[in-house]
């Protein structure tokens, strides 16, 4: 929990567009947050470590919003590892793994006005599907 909170606190730019700043309570809530009609066994919350230090976290839901789609709820790379290919490498590995087990698409939401997040997902092959309260993006796999 401390490692996740520290990673979040180091990413203040994200929280400028997605307030409020993370707390222990909000992280605990995120660990069990689910979209409608999904169960905990459909959710993965994964930490990626380098040299014993948390480098990134990934939260995704299998089979949402359709059976062949995986929804990324959160992906955050530690500030000190950004710009070094760590995030793109994780997404590349996730994409290959999901394709192998039969998924055809990955979707996610990006906060409007967050140029860093939007550019990251565009660079990794995601395209805009629609804009609501946030920008929905997808990548066909």
Predicted regions and their residues:
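Acetyl-CoA-dependent GNAT
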Residues: 2-80, 91-93, 97, 130-134
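Conserved GNAT acetyl-CoA-binding A-motif
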Residues: 98-109
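Conserved beta-strand-loop-alpha-helix junction that forms the acyl-donor binding cleft
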Residues: 108-117
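Conserved acetyl-CoA-binding loop of GNAT-fold acetyltransferases
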Residues: 122-131
């Amino acid at each position: 929990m401390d490692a996740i909170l520290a990673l979040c606190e180091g990413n203040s730019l994200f929280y400028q567009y997605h307030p409020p700043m993370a707390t222990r309570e909000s992280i605990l809530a995120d660990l069990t947050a689910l979209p409608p009609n999904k169960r905990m066994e459909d959710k993965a919350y994964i930490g990626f470590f380098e040299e014993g230090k948390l480098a990134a976290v990934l939260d995704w839901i299998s089979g949402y919003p359709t059976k062949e789609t995986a929804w990324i709820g959160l992906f955050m790379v530690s500030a000190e590892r950004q710009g070094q290919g760590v995030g793109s490498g994780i997404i590349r590995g996730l994409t290959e793994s999901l394709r192998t087990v039969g998924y055809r698409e990955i979707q996610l939401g990006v906060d409007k006005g967050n140029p860093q997040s939007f550019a990251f997902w565009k660079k990794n092959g995601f395209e805009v599907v629609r804009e609501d309260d946030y920008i929905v993006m997808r990548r066909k796999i």
